[in-house]
Amino acid sequence: MATIVDQAKAQMAKSVESTKENFSGIRTGRANPALLNGITVDYYGAPTPLKAVATIGVPEPRTLAVTPFDASQANAVEKALRDSDLGASPRRDGNVIRLTMPELTEERRKEYVKIAKGKAEDGKVAVRNIRRKAKESLDKAIKDGDMGEDEGDRLLKELDKVTKQTTDELDALLETKQKEIMEV
């Protein structure tokens, strides 16, 4: 029956990873290739993720360099970057498209912090749902006689401990992200 807690722990770890991934798409003062994850390019008529049609590098702290694999698609890549809501205008430099990230205003930083808080809360909701399902499984096992009350109580305490550790980890991630965003 400890497998119920182990499964919950694994699912909570996935939730933390998902939250980290979501955080990587939120802009900070620095250029980060993950900012371009949601951008799709009209590649020969088919919407294709940018990272599938170009390499993305960070030559300078506030600059992203996007190099299409196929030079003939540079215009399509540039158009996709221009149409995105990054707030940066692409500059062509031969086959390389450079995106210089503008400094974030205080208002925009606060907006990004708000988005980060929302994503962290989504992660916490997922963790609470995982805990609830695991608790229901433990309660059912006790009711069906598959485990004793004492064993169930011990596993529930372990589940609560794992849940608290995970929510604390999400809080720490949020705090770190907030500092990154507010850093001038």
Swiss-Prot record:
Pfam families named among the record's database cross-references: RRF (PF01765)
Record flagged with keyword Iron: no
GO terms for MF: ribosomal large subunit binding
Top-level taxon of the source organism: Bacteria
Cell compartments where the protein resides: Cytoplasm
Example GO biological process: translational termination
UniProt keyword terms in alphabetical order: Cytoplasm, Protein biosynthesis
Cellular component aspect of the GO annotation: cytoplasm
NCBIfam families to which the protein is assigned, alphabetical: frr
Functional summary from the UniProt entry: Responsible for the release of ribosomes from messenger RNA at the termination of protein biosynthesis. May increase the efficiency of translation by recycling ribosomes from one round of translation to another.
HAMAP family, alphabetized: RRF (MF_00040)
Protein's name according to its UniProt entry: Ribosome-recycling factor
Organism: Bifidobacterium adolescentis (strain ATCC 15703 / DSM 20083 / NCTC 11814 / E194a)
